[in-house]
């Protein structure tokens, strides 16, 4: 048996202490981020493990760190991969209807919440384009429910808006995101889950420890993922922001992200989806025209199936 601790940004009492009390025959830990405040406790716990693995300097991304750690422990070179989740194919917990976009305006850290007015404006734009809009979040975030409603009302759009804040468990949230045309989220757990599900995802990112968790490195960023940020000279503050008056204010690096930045990121993902649907329709219309010319007696019927992302005929009747 082996006990491991491979997180870089960690707390000794919540991570290293567990390895210590496990009494495993072999213990391995990565070299963590150490500040002057945490140096003494980390020094003690690190002195108790059998092996320490240095996964790289700050701000090496956690995905890269995990693969370096696994490679060192196993003795094999394991190249980093984009996160992936295989999830059930179950209908989302909303009524069937038009395609929908999922918006996640919450976050455990109030300062990382992009302004609700921005989400409301985005919801209005998505509705104008024919998408339904589904708001999600934890039950603890229902305190902002009225504010969300008012922001949507101020944007002049209520039809096709579905508020699922506090109404889903984790599996249902995954069901919702798996079938979404797009997911837009603050830098929080559901954003990473959406990316791992393979859904088109836009993540609104601040600079507290930029590059450690988000954005993902290019080599492990899926083609249908966008990270939106507005770089500032105070990046890498570790969220100890000196520019806000209290802990409930939005971090300036989050507030500085413009609505059109987020919309452009959404467009870059939706455009590809819309173009694909248009090409499929064009292909189908031309195919049916050719069939009709070949069979003037009556309209032919063709069964279609998605194959490798393309609509193809499989049987003529």
Task: Report the location of each language-model feature.
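Catalytic machinery of carbohydrate-active enzymes
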Residues: 1-317
């Amino acid at each position: 048996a082996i006990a491991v601790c491979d997180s870089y940004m960690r707390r000794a009492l919540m991570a290293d202490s567990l390895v210590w009390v496990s009494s495993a025959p072999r213990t391995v830990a990565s070299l963590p981020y150490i500040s002057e405040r945490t140096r003494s406790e980390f020094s003690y716990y690190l002195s108790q493990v059998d092996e320490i693995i240095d996964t790289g300097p700050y701000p090496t991304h956690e995905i890269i760190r995990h693969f370096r750690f696994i490679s060192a422990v196993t003795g094999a070179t394991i190249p980093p991969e984009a996160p992936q989740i295989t999830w059930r194919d179950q209908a989302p917990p909303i009524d069937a209807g038009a395609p929908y976009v999922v918006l996640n305006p919450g976050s455990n850290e109030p300062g990382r919440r992009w302004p609700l007015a921005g989400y409301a404006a985005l919801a209005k734009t998505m509705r104008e384009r024919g998408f339904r809009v589904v708001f999600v979040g934890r039950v603890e975030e229902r305190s902002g429910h009225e504010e969300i409603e008012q922001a949507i009302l101020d944007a002049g759009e209520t039809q096709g808006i579905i508020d699922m804040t506090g109404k889903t468990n984790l599996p249902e949230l995954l069901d919702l995101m798996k079938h979404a045309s797009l997911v837009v989220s603050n830098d929080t757990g559901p954003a990473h889950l959406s990316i791992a599900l393979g859904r088109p995802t836009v993540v609104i990112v601040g600079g507290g420890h930029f590059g450690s968790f988000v954005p993902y490195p290019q080599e492990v960023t899926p083609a249908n993922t966008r990270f939106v940020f507005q770089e500032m000279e105070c990046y890498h503050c570790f969220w100890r922001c000196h520019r806000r008056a209290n802990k409930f204010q939005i971090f300036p690096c989050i507030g500085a992200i413009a609505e059109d930045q987020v919309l452009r990121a959404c467009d870059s993902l939706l455009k590809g989806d819309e173009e694909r649907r248009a090409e499929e329709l064009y292909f189908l219309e031309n195919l049916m025209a050719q069939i009709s010319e070949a069979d003037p007696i009556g309209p032919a019927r063709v069964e279609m199936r998605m194959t490798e992302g393309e609509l193809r005929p499989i049987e003529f009747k």
